[in-house]
Regions:
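Glycine-rich loop(s) and the adjacent beta-strand/alpha-helix scaffold that form part
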Residues: 256-327, 542-545, 549-558
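Conserved N-terminal/central alpha/beta ligand/cofactor-binding core
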Residues: 11-14, 40-57, 62-64, 103-222, ...
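Extreme N-terminal leader/targeting segments of oxidoreductases
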Residues: 2-74
């Protein structure tokens, strides 16, 4: 077709496509200029005077002859992630005729923490959110640049969202752990409101999105995997559907959606071009990937081609957990495939959030470390290399218990005595956390030399003085979050930010309808999750744990229920039968001896896999994940391979949360190898 799958998913395909003179043409499809020539049709050239920024490009021209199929439905959901699967589940319960497009071969990774306000779980725990304070605090985070009417939807409807999901998850054996912890209030320090809203389902298996997939399949629905959004179709001010491309065959499909299109495609965190243009602080301070690399901002771009507006300021969600080796700077590096990636091999090092002493490359303390997750990272963007060093001693376990941080940083506290053995020591062995019997030796291991080493040792001594005084006269950190550096061995590590997602996206109103720059509704177009903006500016309020996901799930449910109230037919069920799925788990029990090879689709192309079988047993599996994200698929693949060998096949082997696309590709390739051996 002239466009590789990898280039297409990067978003570069649009630049090779012609441009419609008057925007998107209804009832047409995207093809490359070279294909148009081969078919004897002329594709327009890109407009030389385009006013669109380079990251956005122009809307593709649409040629009817490129369409292989036309699908008709009432509701089109684009994206099978957290929001998309929630919308699909609610729609399936009501018998709505809908389809779900998903560019990958599996549903998106499940985020397990969601925020819901004054839910039944909260009431059972005796917790109540001060809604007026919550609303005021949320607005303060954005300097008033949010739409409080949109915020109110999450505040007012998230309890119902929880009550909808809870029976589904409980029936699968999952248990909700409602967090009702409070931070200690102190004088002379910013009082952050941390509302009791976090609902954590404390078993990752089965994952919620997989559970919802199975739920809709039981009702006769299915997900159109391996179909990537190309653009939306539009008549006047009304969105009529979308064009998608089958990323395996290259074929184009037009989907006509009579009642609406829901954009649930996530943010643009996996698109370095958009990040560098829209969120320039990210390359200044981020070192780690904790996002789905296939989230390229395509839903945002497609909506903007259809006339939508997006938030004016960035809102990257960055946690202070991007563990790197000494000497590594923040920002992108280019991997062996020529792609921009972040350098850390670790997705998130959770203890990075703990308020221990932090110094820059000059060995100098530069802030009060008792802050929300992104504050140290943002401050480090102004320091050398965009990174900083965290230091603590062997009292780390008791210190963490006293600090009593909230949100997902509490995972470190919950480890108790296992913290050193299970989390810190493995990174010592990996060479990322340094350990020494003296602070001077630690300084050497961390790369401090000359004046910087002198500063580091002086800063450690000063920090001990502040601990003894129980008064941080230098930066004002609360006394209960001071710690001493006196009990060897000592630990030190370098940190940058770990990017989770972007929260700046399409303008929406309180019904999740997408808006134009003139604040007019684009008919039939809706957005949820990180494709829906209007709530976050500059950062994410990390002390509102689970707000991002809770908002996503609530908005998705709201859209479907709104359309039903407006008259979208119910009780119809799916209009198209589900295709036969060839993904059954297999065992090597009756297989012939030999070494077999196959390829599975990963995030960044094919994953070569080989399986060696002897006497009906899998004795060795290799999976080349060098093209996958190191901190995601690169970490998950070794364990998955071990599980496959132990299970003698793929029966009962689960994907690893956070790396489902890579894992699914390996599992499918192993199945293909087993089939060859039967």
């Amino acid at each position: 077709m002239g466009i590789s799958r990898r280039d297409f998913l990067r978003g570069t395909a649009a630049s090779a496509l012609g441009i419609a003179a008057a925007g998107l043409v209804p009832g047409a499809a995207v093809i490359s200029a070279s294909v148009a020539a081969a078919e004897g049709e002329k594709a327009a050239a890109p407009a030389a005077d385009s006013k669109n920024p380079a990251w956005l490009g122009e809307a593709p021209v649409i040629l009817e002859s490129s369409i292989s199929e036309v699908w008709k439905t009432d509701l089109l959901i684009i994206g099978a992630g957290n929001g998309g699967m929630m919308a699909a589940s609610v729609a399936a319960d009501n018998g709505v005729d809908f389809r779900v497009l998903e560019q990958n071969s599996v549903v998106g990774d499940t985020r397990h923490w969601y925020g819901a306000i004054n839910s039944s779980a909260a009431k059972a725990a005796g917790a109540e959110v001060d809604i007026s304070l919550l609303r005021s605090e949320a607005s303060r985070y954005t300097s008033g640049k949010m739409d409080q009417r949109v915020l109110n939807v999450w505040i007012n409807e998230s309890a119902a969202m929880h009550d909808y999901l809870a029976p589904i998850l409980e029936a699968a054996g999952l248990v909700c752990d409602f967090a009702n912890d409070k931070e200690q209030e102190v004088e002379h320090h910013t009082r952050y409101y941390c509302p009791p809203q976090q609902h954590f389902w404390n078993d990752y298996n089965p994952q919620r999105n997989v559970l919802l997939k199975e739920r809709i399949e039981a009702k006769g629905y299915y997900i159109d995997f391996n179909h990537s959004l190309v653009c939306l179709t539009k008549e006047g001010n009304k969105v009529t559907g979308a064009i998608a491309q089958n990323v395996l065959t290259g074929a184009y499909v037009r989907v006509e959606a009579a009642w609406g299109v829901l954009i649930a495609t996530g943010g643009y965190e996996g698109n370095p071009e958009m990040i560098e243009a829209l969120a320039p602080i990210v390359p200044k301070c981020v070192t780690a990937c904790s996002f789905n690399p296939s989230n390229k901002g395509m839903g945002i771009k497609a909506a903007m081609w259809a006339g939508a507006e997006r938030d004016l300021e960035a809102a990257p969600m960055i946690f202070d957990r991007g563990l790197v080796a000494p000497g590594v700077n923040a920002g992108y590096v280019v991997n062996e495939n020529g792609e921009k990636v972040f350098p850390s091999p670790v997705r998130q090092f959770n203890p990075g959030t703990q308020p221990f002493l932090k110094v820059d490359r000059d060995g100098v303390r530069f802030m009060d470390e008792s802050q929300p997750y992104n504050d140290a990272v943002h401050a480090a963007a102004r320091r050398k290399g965009g990174v900083y060093c965290q230091v603590f001693d062997s009292n780390v376990v008791s210190d963490v218990q006293r600090f009593f941080t909230l949100g997902c940083s509490a995972i470190t506290r919950m480890q108790g005595d296992a913290l050193i053995e299970k989390t810190i020591e493995p990174q010592v062995e990996a060479g990322l956390v340094k350990k020494a019997d003296t602070l001077e030796e630690l300084a050497d291991l961390l790369g401090f030399t000359g004046k910087a080493k002198e500063n580091f040792l002086a800063t450690c001594a000063r920090y001990n003085e502040l601990y003894d005084m129980q008064d941080d006269v230098d930066f004002g950190k609360p006394a209960y979050r001071l710690s001493e550096l006196r009990k060897p061995p000592y630990y030190g590590l370098w940190l940058g930010g770990s990017l989770l997602c972007t929260g700046d996206a399409l303008w929406i109103n309180e019904d999740m309808q997408v808006l134009t720059p003139e604040r007019e509704v684009i008919e039939n177009l809706y957005a949820t999750g990180n494709a829906a903006g209007t709530t976050f500016v500059d950062n994410y309020p990390e002390l509102f744990p689970g707000m991002c996901l809770g908002r996503n799930l609530t908005f998705a449910k709201h859209v479907v229920e709104k359309l039903i109230r407006d008259g979208m037919p119910t009780g119809k069920g799916p209009s198209m039968a589900a295709p036969v799925q060839d993904n059954e788990a297999l065992t090597a029990e009756n297989c012939k001896d030999g070494t077999y090879t196959a390829k599975g689709r990963g995030i960044n192309g094919d994953i070569p896999v080989s399986v060696e079988i002897k006497g009906g047993k899998i004795v060795h599996v290799t999976a080349d994940v060098s093209a996958e994200t190191p901190s995601l698929g690169g970490v998950a693949a070794p364990k998955l391979v071990e599980d496959i060998v132990a299970a003698n096949g793929t029966v009962g082997v689960d994907t690893v949360s956070g790396s489902t696309i890579t894992c699914e590709g390996i599992l499918r390739a192993v199945n293909d190898c087993i089939k060859q051996a039967l």
